[in-house]
Curated annotation (Swiss-Prot):
The modification Phosphoserine is found at residues 413, 418. SUPFAM superfamilies: Kelch motif. Keywords: Kelch repeat, Phosphoprotein, Repeat. The keyword Phosphoprotein applies. Kelch repeats lie at residues 77-129, 133-187, 188-241, 243-289, 308-361, 443-494. InterPro entries: Kelch-typ_b-propeller, Kelch_domain_protein. The gene is KLHDC4. The keyword Kinase does not apply. Residues 11-24 have a biased composition (Basic and acidic residues). This is Kelch domain-containing protein 4. Residues 1-10 have a biased composition (Basic residues).
Length: 520
């Protein structure tokens, strides 16, 4: 009894601490939000000038990350919304809507009256009813210098059949946040986690909300069991059995004044209705087998064929008090919820190129240790180096690591350590984090994202696809355009700061239909 009482008391203490921190963050961020609300209102005034929907063919979108890429439920289309771009001095936020036709390989820019305000790090979920609906919740807006943030708590729906935006107002929903995750479960949207940040404070969440698509009402769920600790940027997917898997993510905590320590989570949990009741949920800790991804943040997720969850890229940051360095990834993993097992996704290479090669390493035994930021097997990876000359003359070197070929989405057996036939896979997307992923007709599409070259952030605008049934080779649909790679050195001058404010959103007062910008 004594131990149980202490445990419950400790739990209540943690809840009180979290409540105090949220109140503190809310108070300090209110002034910042008031400043940014005025800027957001200015851009909404510009957007209000649109009176009719205009669809025009266009070149591929400009570089960005932390946008949403969604699959149209009825057409051969991918829908890109929002995102951000940083050029070293200015933070740009977007609320543009692009449609990519996967069959025709064409882009269309769709300007719709009264769209959601500019944002990034939001969540977008497509449901089939009514000819298709795209539901968008939350995300963030940043000041031009990227030092102040406004976190949205609004809910929008894009009616795909009529191409109209609608803001859905309902009380009792989640607080303002970004980096959260949201999935469609039956006729509900289930939302988990995220974070809220002001200039000096931040808070991470592990709460769960449900939005009913029939009654348009929010409800906060209180699952039993031990669930994930507060985090953002996790994997969240629905299993064929009707559960919801949450994996990984990122959070940080203050260890001393002005010093924060980040945590890359690698644990997995299952959220499911208890006893079949949709009003009562339970968390269960999971321990999947197989070849797991190395701990990382900034990875991207999509649903693959056979109800598998696809996991791509990310970054493993090594944090010190005065510096931050990271290793970026372009590897693929599949999680099979039916077998509760991870698989590495490796390319087989074109069938026309047949070589005999020995596999570099076997699958690690379950529970085996792996390096925190990845590591090579016996057969070393092949590294391709590509130099891109930006418009300003800067040479950006892209290093791409190709792993040894193997089976995709299947466990490795000891027999597979013998000689096998495989070709060398073609180069695909370079290592990156915060990319946009979507799967349509068994084909994976990877768009944009970012990586770092020294002190420079390179934001991408390339588009690649991979047939997940064949797993032979990547195909580049849009190459990275050097002319879009602008990087300005940091400046502390007030004059430059004033110039930046006019550039936020990427539009002038005279033209509200051009590019805008964002920050995660």
């Amino acid at each position: 009894m004594g131990k149980k009482g202490k445990k419950e008391k400790k739990g209540r203490g943690a809840e009180k601490t979290a409540a105090k921190m949220e109140k503190k963050v809310s108070k300090r961020s209110r002034k910042e939000e008031e400043d940014l609300e005025a800027l957001i209102a200015h851009f909404q005034t510009l957007d209000a000038k649109r009176t009719q929907t205009v669809e025009l063919p266009c070149p591929p979108p400009s570089p960005r990350l932390n946008a949403s890429l969604s699959v149209h439920p009825e057409k051969d289309e991918l829908i890109l919304f929002g995102g951000e771009y940083f050029n070293g001095q200015k933070t740009f936020l977007y609320n543009e809507l692009y449609v990519y036709n996967t069959r025709k390989d064409t882009w269309t820019k769709v300007d719709i009256p009264s769209p959601p305000p500019r944002r990034c790090a939001h969540q977008a979920v497509v449901v089939p009813q009514g000819g298709g609906q795209l539901w968008v919740f939350g995300g963030e807006f940043a000041s031009p210098n990227g030092e102040q943030f406004y976190h949205y708590k609004d809910l929008w729906v894009l009616h795909l059949a009529t191409k109209t935006w609608e803001q859905v107002k309902s009380t009792g929903g989640p607080s303002g946040r970004s980096g959260h995750r949201m999935v469609a479960w039956k006729r509900q949207l289930i939302l988990f986690g995220g974070f809220h940040e002001s200039t000096r404070d931040y808070i991470y969440y592990n709460d769960v909300y449900a939005f009913n698509l029939d009654t348009f009402t929010w409800s906060k769920l209180s699952p039993s069991g031990t669930g994930p600790t507060p985090r953002s940027g996790c994997q969240m997917s629905v299993t064929p059995q009707g559960g919801i898997v949450v994996y990984g993510g990122y959070s940080k905590q203050r260890v001393k004044k002005d010093v924060d320590k980040g945590t890359r989570h690698s644990d997995m949990f299952l959220l499911k209705p208890e006893d079949g009741r949709e009003d009562k949920w339970v968390w269960t800790r999971m321990n999947p087998s197989g070849v797991k991804p190395t701990p990382r943040s900034g990875f991207s997720v999509a649903m693959a064929p056979n109800h598998q969850t696809l996991f791509f890229g990310g970054v493993c940051d090594e944090e010190e008090e005065e510096s931050l360095s990271g290793e970026f990834f372009n590897d693929l993993y599949f999680y099979d919820a039916t077998r509760n097992r991870w698989f590495e996704g490796q390319l087989k290479g074109p069938k026309s190129e047949k070589k005999k090669r020995r596999r570099g390493r076997k699958e690690e035994p379950e529970g085996g240790s792996r390096p925190a930021c990845g590591g090579a097997g016996t057969q070393g990876p092949v590294q391709l180096v590509k130099e891109v000359v930006a418009e300003d003359g800067t040479v950006v070197t892209i290093k791409q690591v190709l792993t040894a070929p193997g089976s995709a989405g299947q466990p490795r057996s000891e027999d597979e350590d013998s000689l096998e036939e495989a070709g060398s896979p073609a180069p695909g997307p370079c290592p990156r984090s915060n990319a946009m992923l979507a799967v349509k007709h068994g084909v994976l599409y990877v768009y944009g994202g970012m990586f770092e070259a020294g002190d420079r952030q390179v934001t991408l605008s390339d588009l690649h696809c991979l047939d997940l049934h064949r797993m032979e080779a990547w195909k580049a649909l849009v190459e990275m355009d050097p002319e879009t790679q602008e990087w300005l050195e940091e400046t502390d001058s007030e004059e430059d700061s004033e110039e930046v404010e006019g550039a936020e959103g990427g539009v002038d007062d005279e033209d509200s239909g051009e590019e805008s910008g964002a920050e995660d």
